[in-house]
Regions:
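Short beta-strand/loop element within the Bergerat-fold HATPase_c
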Residues: 38-48, 55
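ATP phosphate-binding glycine-rich loop and adjacent ATP-lid/helix-beta elements
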Residues: 63-94
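Glycine-rich acidic phosphate-binding loop
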Residues: 55-61
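Conserved short strand/loop->alpha-helix "switch" segment adjacent to the catalytic nucleotide/phosphoryl-transfer site
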Residues: 2-23, 65
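Conserved transmitter core of two-component histidine kinases
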Residues: 1-8, 51, 85-88
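Conserved ATP-binding N-box helix of the HATPase_c
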Residues: 16-39
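Structural motif
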Residues: 35, 46-48, 89-91
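Short C-terminal beta-strand
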Residues: 91-103
Length: 106
């Protein structure tokens, strides 16, 4: 599996951990469901935080695809830190994370 990262990854611990979890989940899903060989990550700083786009070179998602356990758990982690997560399944899988710098307090 190849992973191509464009931009930089935030070094703030909470943001970096969620980004890592997202990339790992997308690699797993690319192998299991899309039968792809490459995951593309775009990560860039925006006002107040970071935006991350993740997609792959695999097969188009089946009609009616939805978030499973791994993506749902990722969504919970993102929202717990005050971020947003968008998933799109058409025409290709796309995961978008918007993560604030600082997040929420423990």
């Amino acid at each position: 599996m190849d992973v191509e990262i464009e931009g930089e990854i935030c070094e703030e611990t909470k943001v970096a951990l969620i980004t890592d979890k997202a990339i790992r989940e997308c690699i797993t899903n690319c192998i299991r469901h899309a039968h792809g060989s490459k995951v593309y990550v775009q990560s860039y700083k925006v006002l107040g935080g970071w935006k991350i786009h993740i997609t792959n070179d695999g097969e188009r998602p089946k009609e009616g695809s939805k978030e499973g356990g791994g993506l749902s758990a990722l969504r919970e982690a993102v929202e717990r830190e005050g971020g947003q997560m968008i998933t799109r399944f058409d025409p290709r899988f796309l995961l978008v994370l918007e993560l604030p710098v600082g997040g929420t307090e423990d």
